[in-house]
Amino acid sequence: VIDMMQKLNLQVKEEHSRHSFFLLMEEVTLATCKQAVEWIFENNFQEDRADLLNMVITSPGGDLNAAFALVDTMRGSAIPIRTIGLGQIASAGLMIFIAGEKGNRILTPNTSILSHQYSWGAFGKEHELFATVKEFDLTTKRMISHYKKCTGLSEKKIREVLLPPQDMWLSATEAKELGLCDAVKDIN
């Protein structure tokens, strides 16, 4: 089944230029984000540009640094990007989803959202661990800044409801109440 979904995903990506749709229906990795970045660049450099790009997202999360590379590219796009969430949007996938154009971040009613604190394992010499702690702090600050920009929530509220010690699962309606999306509706 996974192999079939990957083949379907690749077929749609080959045709996305004509339809201005991109499916991110997998783990967030450098490779998957590279494909999305290329799609955004290709569409932005076309003479006859689309008015709106559509990124459909179902993701269990993954590499947060790769996600932020895509987020920065989305922010730099001259073409607004609508994000459409289906099924589950978790962790790094959520960072990408909320970067969509305000007013154009749509969740379907059955979408589950997962937000949690940044996690990372580390080992090494003392100086290496101190460097890791600094990177951990910088990444947490980037996450909070991104949440603030995309939701309008205060840092205190973000830490309470989106980045508490435990994983935070939200329904699509709860996500809308927190400003993570702009609409909850079926795809027509």
Name these PLM-found stretches.
Residues 1-188:
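Terminal-region recognition feature
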